[in-house]
Amino acid sequence: MRTAKLLAILLPFTCAGQTFLSAVSAAPPQVVRESPDRAQNGLALSAGSGDPRTTSTDWPGFLGPHRNGKSDEHGLPNAWPPKGLPVVWQQAVGTGYSAPAISNGQLFHFSRTKDSAQLKCLNAETGAEQWTCEYPSNFVDMLGYNNGPRATPVVDGPNVYTFGAEGVLQCVRIADGHPAWRLDTTKQFNVVTKFLGVGSTPLVWHDLLLVNVGGSPPGGPPDVYWANGAVDSNGSAIVAFDKATGAVRWQTGNDLASYSSPVVAKINGRDTVFMLARNNLLAIDPEKGQTIAQFPWRARKLESVNASTPVVAGDEIFVSETYEVGSAVVRFDSAKFTEVWTDRNRRRNQAMALHWNTPIELDGYLYGSSGYHAPEAELRCVEWKTGKLMWSEPGMTRSSLLLVDGKLVCLSEDGTLRILKPSPQKYEELAKWEYGVGEGEETRCSAALCAQAFHQQLVLVIQHRR
């Protein structure tokens, strides 16, 4: 099979029955293959155009190589074949909301099968399984969503890291699929059970693995409902583990865990880690392991969560949530945060209210899916410097975005994949594809965790079989 560009997209499902992770081509096909393994839940793949302008780029974890949803690859077409995008291969996976990670021709997918959390390593071109690393998991979602992992695998050199819904953090050797180390952060840091388990993807920074842990002092409440949200912190909002051994190097932040993932940016010549925790946006010095500043940002509702990952542009940071306070842009001067604009206490409608998705920043504008429930969700464009709403497009259900070759790749919960031309003037759709299924099948994802990955123009789609 000729190497071709791969657009990898994962749609998580919650309905009962079988699920298949499918990989399909984002460009006209050359070769179509199918894996013989079509077990209970699955993954499928198709070949792309093999555009000679394309340079293959790994997608080693959540939001891609730069952790901002932007790909370095080129050659994404403006239109797709009238009959849609063909399937290349299909592979069984378990339940969960984890996106795929892709590196050196290997695809890593983390899911739950019965009482086992499973990290699978697949050949990205053929879907053939190379190994599976698993451990027991008894996590049960408090709100009735599925019990699989939420965080995306992180590939770093010879290792891949996972963070399970129950709080198990592990380092797995890519060469043989065996764990180099494994630990339970829930037990080690006394993490009080929260609504949806662990949902933050760790960040590799030099020789450290930075993790959104959010533990509490011993003897605390059994869960957030029992305590009516009054849960103390033990100073482990973010914990730095030695990525080679799992030893704790430092911990900082008097806050609890969120479903947002940390990012790192260079501000005034120094690396700063930004993490939207349960109650605050934190600025952290990763060299000293100290919290520099915090900016309060959380809705008053007990069940509210901070889940969108901060977006950094220059010395400014965008944060958002969907339950009450909406969005804000703050400026960080290496010592403190200063508001640029905020939705909080605005009389007009909020600029953006992001639930699970992280927006794309491009040329001074933000593009993201605003809305709590699928029926009310709409795609929006907002001016970065003012929060001014430029346009909104309803009726798309909740969606996630990537920026590829100057175009937006938009994946919606209902399984619709679109290519959009980014413009602050108006919504402009270049291509649209609804993933086709056979009789007795449906394609949809839930909780707006329609995570995507881009590598060599193959599309990964989850297909549910009733």
Can you describe what each PLM-predicted range is?
Residues 5-19:
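Bacterial N-terminal signal peptides
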Residues 1-3:
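N-terminal secretory signal peptides that target proteins for export/translocation
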Residues 18-466:
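Noncatalytic, solvent-exposed loop/strand surfaces
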